[in-house]
Amino acid sequence: MLSGLVIVDKPQGWTSHDVVGRMRRLAGTRKVGHAGTLDPMATGVLVVGINKATRLLTYIVGTSKTYTATIRLGQSTITDDAEGDVIAAVSAAAVADEAIHDGVAALTGEIQQVPSSVSAIKVNGERAYARVRSGKEVKLAARPVAIHRFEVHRINREAGGDVVDVDVTVECSSGTYIRALARDLGDGLGVGGHLTALRRTHVGPYSLDQARTLEQLAEELNVLEMSQAARALMPNRELTAEETTEISFGRRIAAGAEAGDPAAATTEHPAAAFAPDGSLVALLADSGNFAKPVLVFAPGNGASGNSAPGNAAPGTAAGGDA
């Protein structure tokens, strides 16, 4: 059975669900999921899990993301991106480059961000975007996000008139809305702003260099096999043959060397455990003097792909970031 991650370069105009549907047909299985939604307008890295690799998606969702984007200052839209109608326009012609850099700096680091009202966040059981489209008022609470890097590459006034386009790179925590950053930069400068282009270049350790278009994947399904995917994603632990057998049956083994300090593996941030032949056996969490399996992937005696006793297996995950 084919299992692994596929790093897709999502095309513009496709929803993340559209991509999952296409991958189901290409992989010949319905057990396919993705690790973080990209808006239809956005392009770039969408991590897709196939079969057993869907178990890894939970641990990918929470990783940092990197984007390149273009922010248009001088116009606000209902969606905070180019897909929505312009609802306000204030000339940005007089906004100095220095002010733009200062505005970007103010939005860097640990910040409180109000997500875009046209988002998949639920309000009283209803998606925020559905409430907006039906004419209802939507007020979302601010939440903490981390903007690790917010870098201006180019300030373009060539379009003339009242708008200024700013090309940026953003590295951020999971759950950050780049549309909201564009909105907040414009609001901070007093002219409004929205996103006109967005491309995701990294999701955790996975990058555009590894990504393939859907057309390329239709010709050759390029799959990052389980052990490679896990080695890149989380701390590694090499098992002995005896430990491999124990873990394969869901039993605990001696804790790793890091047990008891901040580097220790946890249920939320486990270590990937590998057999002597390099294959992925399980995900482990340290608990006192022992390491216990969080998920078991090892072949043999029915252990393949099962959760460890007493532990619920994470399912296919999808998070919103764009």
Model features per residue range: what roles?
Residues 1-180, 184-210, 283, 290:
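RNA pseudouridine synthases
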Residues 1-11, 17-34, 38, 42-43, ...:
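Accessory RNA 3′-end/elbow-binding domains used by RNA modification enzymes
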